[in-house]
Amino acid sequence: MTEFVPLTWHDTLYLAPELILAAMFLILIVTDLILPGRTNRAIIGWLSLAGLLLSLAAVIWRMIDMNPSGVSAAEAAEAGKAISLLGASYRVDDYGNLLKIIFLIGTSLVVLLGLGSTQKDDAVTDKAEFYYLLLPAAAGAMIMASSGNLVTLYIGLELLSITTYVLVGLRKRSSLSAEAAFKYVVTGGIASAFVLFGMSYLYGVTGSVSLADFPTALPQAFTDYKALVYVGFFFLIAGFGIKIAAAPFHIWAADVYQGAPTPVSAFLAVIAKGAALAAVFRFLYSSAFFLTGGPGKQAGDDVFFALLVIAAAAMIAGTVSALRQKQVKRLLALSGVANAGYLLVPIAISVTIIHSNNFSEFVFYLVAYLLMNVGAFAVVTVIARAAGHEELKGFSGLYYRAPWTAAAMLIFILSFSGLPVTAGFFGKLFILLGAASVKAYWLVAIMVVSTVISYYFYFGIIRQMFMRSNGEEEDRIHVPAVTGTVIWICAAATVALGVLPGPLMKWIDAVFTIQADLFVR
């Protein structure tokens, strides 16, 4: 069993990104209490953004330190070793670092999106708690990405969950928000119970909560406790399936996304979903993956096949359910169900000699998904302000009233659709080629068919923007500078990755290694 090693002051330097967020969270609570009631709470938003960027800088600094240039291969390997803290319960490695960068950038864009909104839009972005609650939520996502045992993983999951429960229900005067908060708390509680129940079974059969012990303990336990191992894994899959809104566990998503403030919906769509996927990725490759080569081979194969089935179901259910949607946030929620399926594919096809770069595919598409989702939700805030609602008809004649915003939304729609030249095209292509390389042709067929079907509702938005008129073409839509900045950061990055995907993929492959960064030893 892994021995517990006390945390030293030197070790806290490795935890700087998380500690920065924790310290800023406490500072902002006190600041909010002492500020006069009439003071604009946007200052809390800007301070939250500063804390997120400072944490991001700390993560990047750690990555540079772990991946030095101009040194020998032996020195580079030594510098790149994962750093285990608190008895391997928390890891600092390039797997976690890459995902933390995504989570922090995504949360920063959500804060900017909130700063670009007004009280009229969501009735929450003038409240300080909207901004500072995003900090512990981001910290929870980061903890999930770096967890080295089941306890740490669950703590990160609950930190993320509890803060998002509050964020979803911040619009106290909105019946939709109250309904969304209730549904999210109930389904989130069920998901947490499933995850904890599954963890308890695996702890019971292995005698350890450390992921470092699972590669040896789990195959041994499988011989005597085959049924319990199956139960543990499938409760965990069901629990995380609810968290990522993958079919058939996705029923809550549309109502919650519709009722939540738009920036919160963007956070749930990207950071909350990405954190759960990151946890599944690391957990399965520290447990079920090691069953595939021993007496538990059938169980390991069954776990990964179950993920493939869920991925396929998510792609089909999300796409079909979105066909008749007229409410844009509900449409984006159901689109997110389908995209959860795409993101599960690199995890579920497993690492083989033939196909070993599934993490690169996962990260690339997660980045593409972040950009097109946050950008699309930013456009929704603009439309909702102008039209007074979030229906699809609000996009009518957008090209004539805000041509640059319409152009940006066109980029996001093309990326969602997986068409050139956007990040979504290469993201889906890399995942499709990965599935084809392991001969999962049935899954390739489902990916292609679901993508083609999705053109109907994605192009419906394009048709509204460019081919429909609401008779108010002379009424120009005002786009706040901060919101416009978010939209064009996302649009420019989406096109850049669609034109030059190679540099990002090569960089991920250069800093990430399966043995050192994914497997917990």
Curated annotation (Swiss-Prot):
Pfam family name, one: Proton_antipo_M
Localisation per UniProt entry: Cell membrane
Principal EC category: translocase
Transmembrane regions listed in the UniProt entry: 15-35, 43-63, 98-118, 128-148, 150-170, 185-205, 227-247, 261-281, 303-323, 331-351, 363-383, 406-426, 442-462, 485-505
GO CC, alphabetical: plasma membrane
EC number: 7.1.1.-
GO MF: NADH dehydrogenase (ubiquinone) activity; NADH:ubiquinone reductase (non-electrogenic) activity; quinone binding
Highest taxon above the source species: Bacteria
Membrane topology classification: Multi-pass membrane protein
Keyword Cytoplasm included in the entry's annotation: no
Keyword line: Cell membrane, Membrane, NAD, Quinone, Translocase, Transmembrane, Transmembrane helix, Transport
Catalytic activity: a quinone + NADH + 5 H(+)(in) = a quinol + NAD(+) + 4 H(+)(out)
GO biological process: ATP synthesis coupled electron transport
Record's function text: NDH-1 shuttles electrons from NADH, via FMN and iron-sulfur (Fe-S) centers, to quinones in the respiratory chain. The immediate electron acceptor for the enzyme in this species is believed to be a menaquinone. Couples the redox reaction to proton translocation (for every two electrons transferred, four hydrogen ions are translocated across the cytoplasmic membrane), and thus conserves the redox energy in a proton gradient.
Family to which the UniProt record says this protein belongs: Belongs to the complex I subunit 2 family.
Alphabetized NCBIfam families for the sequence: NDH_I_N (TIGR01770)
Assembly: NDH-1 is composed of 14 different subunits. Subunits NuoA, H, J, K, L, M, N constitute the membrane sector of the complex.
Protein's recorded name: NADH-quinone oxidoreductase subunit N
This protein's encoding gene: nuoN
